[in-house]
Amino acid sequence: MSVTMREMLEAGVHFGHQTRFWNPKMAPFIFGHRNKIHIINLEKTLPMYLDALKYVRQLAANRGTILFVGTKRQSREILAEEAARAGMPYVDSRWLGGMLTNFKTVKISIKRLKDMEAAKEAGALESMSKKEALMFEREMEKLEKSIGGIKDMGGIPDAIFVVDVGYHKIAVTEAAKLGIPVIGVVDTNHSPEGIDYVIPGNDDSSKAVALYVRGVADAILEGRANAVQEVVEAARGGDDFVEVQEG
């Protein structure tokens, strides 16, 4: 999948925040301002975005796990959809403190959710009173909302992709503590410091968010497909050298 500058323009990637809210550390990525709004330099954004996608592709080819993080209203739905399409974990509700740094505790909640799902599947609700069944459903819904997207993650991810680094400071800090690379969309009002793969761009427009997220999901699927293709070709190539001994 290749993204063009025209597509970025159409999605409004270049629109930053109001000039009075700017972070001076984003100066290298700002083209200018119009109507008191900073304009992001897409000639900087495009190669940086493509570089991030290259990294994602390589990570996916090596069977790496990338955790998608986006809990703002305009990013929630598309982020969950695209992460699921790419077969990756995601956080689309609130980021719970310790989700990475205290993953052992999170695993207990994941086990509880999976046990509840299995119990429901087995018809456990039928033997409960109305009140018990209601309490059960409520707890399960709450767990699904907070950790449903990471229930199959298994362990600490190899990288995290964050749609709005300012809004998800805790996630970025936890990743940094554990040495997990961060791919992050950074708008003009936030700092790019501590982000391994910076994508300077609009983090509020749902169109822009959809562009970033779809691109990352596509890169993951491409990386995996390339890895499978290489295995197939290696196996085919090996056929020429197989000597069958008779008798």
Swiss-Prot record:
Name of a matching Pfam family: Ribosomal_S2
Any one of the GO CC terms: cytosolic small ribosomal subunit
Single GO BP term: translation
Keyword annotations: Ribonucleoprotein, Ribosomal protein
Stored SUPFAM superfamilies: Ribosomal protein S2 (SSF52313)
Keyword Ribonucleoprotein assigned: yes
Annotated TM spans: none
Domain of life: Bacteria
Gene Ontology MF term list: structural constituent of ribosome
Classification via InterPro entries: Ribosomal_uS2, Ribosomal_uS2_bac/mit/plastid, Ribosomal_uS2_CS, Ribosomal_uS2_flav_dom_sf
PANTHER family for this protein: 30S RIBOSOMAL PROTEIN S2 PROKARYOTIC AND ORGANELLAR, SMALL RIBOSOMAL SUBUNIT PROTEIN US2M
Family statement: Belongs to the universal ribosomal protein uS2 family.
Protein name: Small ribosomal subunit protein uS2
Lineage: Bacteria, Pseudomonadati, Pseudomonadota, Betaproteobacteria, Burkholderiales
Encoding gene, per UniProt annotation: rpsB
